[in-house]
Amino acid sequence: MKYLAAFSLLACAASALPSLETKLSVRKGTVGQAILDKALTAKGTPYAWGGGTCDGPSADNPPYQYGDVGYDCSGLVCWAVCQVTGRDLFTEGLRVTSTMYCADEAKLGYKKYPLEERQPGDAIFFGGECDCNTSGSIHHVGLMIDNGDRMWNAPNDDVNQVQENSISNFGEAACPYVIRFT
C-alpha cells in the first residue's frame, strides 16, 4: 500500500509538470526573441557593406569601401544568430541574403514559414521577385520585431545605422517566406 501511495503521488506530480512538447514549444519561441534581443543591442551601429562577423562589426568590403566599421543587413542577422546559438552562418556559406533565403531547409537547419505567420525574431527578406534563380533578386534581410509591420535591420549606406523600419514602407514587398530560428 505504501508503494501504491508513493506511485500515485509521483504520477500526480508528473502530470502537473509541463510536457516535453510544451517545453520545446516554449524553447522554440524564445530562440528567435533572443536573437532579436541581441540584434537590438547593435542600435546605431554604422552600416558597412559586407560588414559583420561572429565577433561583431567589421570593415566594409569592396566595392563599397567608405571606411565604416559595422554591419550590413545579413551580417547583422548572422552575428546575432552566432552570438545566441553558436552557429556560424558566415563559414557555412549562408551569410549572403540570397543564399540564406534560397537554401533548402536541410542545409539551412531552420524552417521557413509563410510571411503571414511571421513572429518576433524571424528573418524577413526583400527583393522584388524573390526568385532564387535570378541573381540579385533577393537583396535585403531584417528581423521581425513583432508579428506585424516592424523589423530591425541595417538598411543601407544612405541611412548608415542599424535601426527599426516598417516592412510596409520599406520600398518593395517582402518575400513570401520568413526563416524561423529555433
Residues covered by each model-derived region:
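N-terminal capping segments
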Residues: 17-87, 136-137
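Low-complexity, Gly/Ser/Thr/Pro-rich intrinsically disordered linker/tail segments
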Residues: 172-182
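Sequence contexts marking disulfide-bonded cysteines in secreted/extracellular proteins
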Residues: 53-55, 103, 131-133, 174-176
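...with weaker cross-activation on analogous glycine-rich loops/strands in unrelated enzymes
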Residues: 24-33, 86-165, 182
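Catalytic cores and adjacent binding grooves of peptidoglycan-active enzymes
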Residues: 168
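Fungal secretory targeting signals
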Residues: 1-20
